Amino acid sequence: MLELTKMNNINNNFKQELIDNGYNEIIVNLLVNRGYDEETICTLLSTGYSEELPIYNDLTNVQIGADIIESHIANGSRIYIYGDYDSDGVNSTYILGDAINNAIYYSNSSAQLSLKVPERCEGYGLNMSWCQSIVANKTTDTLVITVDNGIAQDQEVAYLLDNGIDVLITDHHTPNGHIPANVWIIDAFHNNDNENNKGLCGAGVAFKLAMNLLDRFQCVPNIDELYYKYIVHVAIATITDSMPMTIDNIKYVYNGIQLLKDGYGSEAVTYYRDYNSNTDLTPKDIAFGLGPQINACGRMNNTALALNYLFSDNEDVEDLYNEVVVTNDERKAKTKSSIEQAEKMLDIESPSIVLELDGIEGIAGIIASNLSSKYNKCTIIFSKDMSGKYLIGSARNDGRVDLLNILRSINNNSVVKVGGHSAACGITIKASRIKSFIKELNEILSSLPKEEVEEVVDTKIVVDDYISISDINKDNCESLKDLYFFTESNPVFALTDVTITKTKASNNNKNNMMFSITDNDNNKFEFWSWGIGEQYRALGEPKNVTFIGEIEYKFGKPSFNILNIVPMEMISIC
């Protein structure tokens, strides 16, 4: 028997007061039950919060960072920006790169700017071989700026400093405590800034630095236009990096989406909007559209394409966007074929799934997540590094054990490094030790107490709220559509105890189905849902069910996107 329950289900005076004052009950329940504080909830429910644009001078060391860049521009230095291969890293590089380019151009400086976004196969963060090439080719004063990385690359930073190169670190990750003392750092965690700044993505940090820099270059025209443009890119990065919805991030995402609707942003993102004929964008369009498309470039070792796309102009934006779409399609196809290949290789009797696959560096985590979820096993997908001496892997937990601690306990003759958390880790091992590694991992898993490795069975389904057919209406669709802060996870509802009176499968895809339903109040509703037909038929086509899913618009009218179907005889509603 499955137990259906609401998330937290908090009842307090503040919640009731909001409902009594006429605020949408479903929205109020979502905000309170998800644990947002009263200040954040009031901000979100306020009709005027969209006009409150983010400030950019409140981040520790951001003005010093702007002074450093200004000085190097004035001196005609060589400036490098070193980014990251994901959407946040590429957007961070775009924002700061565009601002510095404008400052150099309009101040008639002889400074030169170069952008470096590594391919995934080069690894995350400052790369020592790249640092060595910068030192070897140094002919003038040089500044290296990291965006969305750098706070954990202590050896690389020290090497640059020791060789006379200035370094400015901008990051939003947790420091490792070993960065040299004589380097300027803009990182809210390193500097113990406020919670709003700790919630920034890399692009948010880059934005604050970029705007402080442009304040020093009033020769740059239309700085307000650049401000609006950059907020769009901060919104994209905030959504795709699944950042916490602090008050500042709410402002970035809400205003960024609104500004994109109004035509702001780079040529690349406004082209994306127009190409998809979507002037009513929501964060979901970014999270499942443009975000994965940009990320696909990094996953397929073509990060330069993502950067070129963001910097594109009217003449080449169409061709570059088409390349990005093709790259994402290739990523999807490669993921599908790699999962199929992996399933042919795995030993179903083994306590774990540990496989080495070729050419899957950027999608190893997706493959590992898929197999771990499907087979309820700790899963690690490896691929060889460029030297062939090491295997770099993505590890995913099946929910039964603390995978990080297990991997840390394995003999260091095999493991080179491991990091992450209990559910998802990155690990590097010596290629020659793969068999020993698998043997030791399986021995550890097999030796754990039975209660720690009992088969995972989902016994509880947690939703944001219970709804009825009458709740699937225009008002709720509009209210939910406007909740741009739900980028971390979309609201999930239980449409409880409905009777299916009619079904119809799509002629083109039997997995897409139309449902006609009714409830105990004799409300009737008809809607289509994608990718659910196989599950429905596997359940024996039950008639009395609870649908788990999302309220949304489909075909221009209120609808329900089914994520799961549970026959009523299999569920207990709390």
What are these regions (language model features)?
Residues 2, 7-8, 12-143, 162-165, ...:
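Hydrophobic helix-and-loop "lid/oligomerization" segment in the mid-to-C-terminal part
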Residues 86-89, 121-123, 146-153, 196, ...:
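Acidic, metal-coordinating catalytic cores used for nucleic-acid/nucleotide bond scission
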Residues 132-133, 137, 141-203, 207-216:
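Active-site cavity-forming subdomains of large catalytic enzyme subunits
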Residues 262, 266-267, 444-535:
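A contiguous loop/helix-start segment that scaffolds small-molecule binding in enzyme catalytic cores
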Residues 513-515, 545-547, 560:
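Hydrophobic residues positioned within well-ordered beta-strands of beta-sheet architectures
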Residues 532-548:
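Short nucleic-acid-contacting surface segments enriched for D/E, G, S/T with interspersed K/R
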Residues 555-574:
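OB-fold/S1-family single-stranded nucleic acid-binding modules
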